[in-house]
Amino acid sequence: MTQKLLLMAAGGTGGHMFPAQALAEAMLRKGWRVKLSTDPRGARYTGGFPHMTEITEVSSATFARGGLLAKAMVAPRIAAGVASMAMQMRRDRPDVVIGFGGYPSIPALGAATLLGLPRMIHEQNGVLGKVNQKFATRVAEVACGVWPTDLPAGAEGIHVGNPVRAAVLERQGAPYIPPGDYPMSLLVMGGSQGARILSDVVPGAIAALPETLRRHLRVSHQAREEDMARVAQFYADAGIDAEVQTFFADVPSRISEAQLVISRSGASSIADISVIGRPSILIPLATAAGDHQTANTRGLVEAGGAIRIPESALDTTSLAEQIAAVLTNAEGATQMAHAALSTGIPDATERLVARVEHLSEEAAP
């Protein structure tokens, strides 16, 4: 029997790449071949993909960036990417093509549309990204990570949840150690691209905590490269035990060990936090398209597993108060952890696998 081929296309952020990685792991176990099409930014996240994943980089571009000349070159680059991908697909025909969003997914989805191949998209957020918005009515279905998801008329949406990596599933529902008079871990995540506002506000908020609480904290803080030195220096000057990095390869482990997570509310972060089950303070990105990061928080916040602070209300004083409220109330923190866990969809990958297999079977002669 011929080995089936899944072609995945994903843009260059962790929010797109991590669900693709989870699907790759599962489909390889099912005996499928798996190809990943991404751009140089996305290639930074491929170190965690199974080694059997066939990875190619494509020509694409982001419409929103650059001056007039740069923007004038976008369409030719994307057209070249679609043409190149169509040639590859003719030589090595995928059984299913799935896009996870981001401009680098345009060549694969565009070529699959031209060739009439079975195709679908996975949308991680409660509001469709620009690329997924364009293709939502041109694919068989939209697998949705958050429900409800705003979909255009004519699009077929199915709730599957957001797939999480094997390293997250290994820690699914890991026992929560409530805060107390002993070393506690606090994880600060700005999403795969970091977040300057967290680097501006969080260190000061931690420094403003009572010394009786602050002395127990061990902070892991993800920051942009340009912010690393000043953030690390601030923690050092304040006598706070902190590790500052641009990217933590062991985020699932750090979430599991944390008494509290402070994070942006990208879809992958929300999925990881809820599947493992940890209290969180979430600060949605104010400029996120369609305010999708606020939409992503609804399930966790309404269940009582998270505290949401809009960027407009974020300052050191208010954040310090919320941190203290969680870390000085062991019973309340434990309830938050259980509530977060109740919102997780640990079988999201299996649900997405089922949709891929269904689409493949529907298209079979």
Curated annotation (Swiss-Prot):
It is a peripheral membrane protein. InterPro entries: GlcNAc_MurG, Glyco_trans_28_C, GlycoTrans_28_N. It is found in: Cell inner membrane. Coiled coil: none annotated. GO terms for molecular function: UDP-N-acetyl-D-glucosamine:N-acetylmuramoyl-L-alanyl-D-glutamyl-meso-2,6-diaminopimelyl-D-alanyl-D-alanine-diphosphoundecaprenol 4-beta-N-acetylglucosaminlytransferase activity; undecaprenyldiphospho-muramoylpentapeptide beta-N-acetylglucosaminyltransferase activity. Belongs to the glycosyltransferase 28 family. MurG subfamily. This is UDP-N-acetylglucosamine--N-acetylmuramyl-(pentapeptide) pyrophosphoryl-undecaprenol N-acetylglucosamine transferase.
